[in-house]
């Protein structure tokens, strides 16, 4: 039993809780700085040449699961450990403190009053009348008063003792929600062109919601840089019910546990005509060798496929750069303009952008929201001072002894106590 008690004392230690919080905070920072859920090759390409913090290369990063910090075994272990420590602390420390605060303590001798943090002694002509005045004054100021055989005990702000327990409960609930969301949540990143859709599967691997992109718009500043991008999406249920809403950066769509974010933008295709051909919608892909946001494709200009040109574009507004096989820039075509290129008449009809959508289903979100509400309530209650006052009298000496203590703001109580005495003396 002694060893169990020692283990429980160690678990409920404030130092251990602070250390765990610090480690978890550092881990979260690492999870923010290191890209998550990428392929192994991504980490080898990016962290072997430039190790994280100068020492953590791809091998170490993958070994310790820094590629998925929030679902790694050690991070979940830290959350469970902290939750256990907070639970033990609540049961072994905070609940007894609350229970003690709820119990009435009966001080019977002036020497006990004298040992309190704040104490005063006054002389009165009528002890019984003075005690009655003090009792009525305390009740008037919102104190909970109990009188036993001419002795008065009063308390105020006991509810403040509930604050730390609620904070612990909220933090435990927060970790439960975070863990549950990490293990059962799903995240999908998808680029959709207008008119395209994505089908989502439910828990039974059956078709669930359908997300359809109706319209996508990129707002640019005078220099041509993307400032905001907006999508009009349609969420369609299997029964045919649907909801249409515009989303943009920082303004997501929330629908029955699913959150749909406007995360990015891209270019999907170029609609083009070559000589007398019908309109051709040609997919384009990012070309990182030419720049961070450059898309392009290679097309032939004649039927044998040998006379090829490279089309590149960096904006849905154009222009389209056309290069020869050797990399020579042949021309720049704006939308709806046609030009002869290597013997072929080429016309750009339009450039089709695509919306980068981030879909998140996190079943732990309700727990997280509830936990923050509980933590806020607990934090507000913790501000409340728990104060206690005792009043005794000695008829033989015509003396009244009054004293009190407070878990915080003792100076406030020391100022409040003389007010009770001055009220009595007047």
UniProtKB/Swiss-Prot annotation:
The keyword Thylakoid applies. It comes from Prochlorococcus marinus (strain NATL2A). One of its GO terms (biological process) is cytochrome complex assembly. This is Cytochrome c biogenesis protein CcsB. Pfam families: ResB. One of its GO terms (cellular component) is plasma membrane-derived thylakoid membrane. It comes from the Bacteria. Required during biogenesis of c-type cytochromes (cytochrome c6 and cytochrome f) at the step of heme attachment. It is a multi-pass membrane protein. May interact with CcsA.
